[in-house]
Swiss-Prot record:
Catalytic activity: L-homoserine + ATP = O-phospho-L-homoserine + ADP + H(+)
Family under the similarity heading: Belongs to the GHMP kinase family. Homoserine kinase subfamily.
Name of the protein in its database record: Homoserine kinase
UniProt GO cellular component terms: cytoplasm
EC number in record: 2.7.1.39
InterPro entries the record matches: GHMP_kinase_C_sf, GHMP_kinase_N_dom, GHMP_knse_ATP-bd_CS, Homoserine_kinase, Ribosomal_Su5_D2-typ_SF, Ribsml_uS5_D2-typ_fold_subgr
Gene: thrB
Record function comment: Catalyzes the ATP-dependent phosphorylation of L-homoserine to L-homoserine phosphate.
Length: 281
């Protein structure tokens, strides 16, 4: 059996912890239960960037605690096409794949919605894992255990600039302030509402004018010297729009001149994936 889980980008600037978008780049995970011991093999472009496979085991143990079902031994072969720790949902892809595998191995007792709630609880926020399941642009709401979302299917291509350094999501969240100026909050509300209004009106490219943010990006950028240099180089190209993908360090922008951008490793031109996770026998 095989499951393909898409890369995701989140926040889209103004929509902090609310907007998530699935992309047409997939980690491919083949698995079978004809084994006596769980083994995990990783190949693909970004396999060498993985430190370990502990997240798979962490998800399996979490699934067992929450459901009471025991995940049987499984043989896993993962093709890593999503950059690791780069703000493109590599961890979310593992969580979604591992939960699917665990559910398959224990009799398919949980619905997609059940798995989604487990993924959100494990990840801590919904904006990566929900679009990985559903595809498309997702507007998420979470309040305690209550999860709600709406999905928009959109036709859009985006370019992501991936640097050769990584950033830890948890560490980047610690940088964020507990309080922000009132006018900064209003700025983000205006932009996120107008972004969504343009999406709802079918004016997809116009929506990208409203990705401006004052709640999280500057804190993350200024908290890392390499990140600051990387973003400043991109901004020096006078882009029409830009935003940090997730907690970084990848940046989405529409610049065409890549010369002189320090630390640049990959340029990924990706379309929105409106299907989400793909499962095949």
């Amino acid at each position: 059996m095989k499951v393909l889980v898409p890369a995701t980008t989140t926040n889209l600037g103004a929509g902090f912890d609310v907007f998530g978008l699935a992309l047409d780049l997939f980690n491919e995970v083949e698995f079978s239960f004809d084994t006596k011991e769980t083994t995990i093999e990783s190949t693909g472009k970004y396999a060498s960037d993985l430190k370990d496979h502990n997240l798979f085991f962490e998800v399996f143990r979490f699934f067992e605690r929450k459901t009471g079902y025991r995940v049987p031994p499984v043989r896993i072969k993962q093709t890593c096409n999503i950059p690791v720790s780069s703000g493109l949902g590599s961890s979310a892809a593992v969580i979604v794949a591992a939960l699917h595998i665990a559910n398959e191995g224990t009799g398919r007792n949980l619905s997609r919605e059940d798995l989604m709630k487990l993924a959100v609880e494990l990840e801590g926020h919904p904006d990566n894992v929900v679009p990985a399941f559903t595809g498309g642009l997702v507007v998420c709401y979470q309040n305690g255990s209550h999860l709600d979302f709406e999905k928009f299917e959109i036709d859009l291509s985006l370019t992501f600039f991936v640097p050769n350094f990584s950033m830890c999501t948890n560490e980047m969240r610690k940088i964020l302030p507990e309080k922000v100026p009132f006018e900064d909050a209003v700025f983000n509300i205006k932009n996120s509402c107008q972004f969504l209004a343009k999406i709802a009106a079918g004016k997809i490219k116009e929506a990208l004018k409203y990705v401006g943010d004052r709640l999280h990006q500057n804190y993350r950028i200024n908290g890392n010297k390499k990140m600051k240099e990387f973003v400043e180089a991109i901004l020096s190209k006078n882009p029409e729009y830009w935003f940090v993908s997730g907690s970084g360090p990848s940046v989405c922008s529409n610049i065409n001149d890549f010369e002189g951008i320090p630390y640049l490793k990959d340029v990924l031109k990706l379309r929105v994936n409106n299907r989400g996770m793909i499962v095949s026998e």
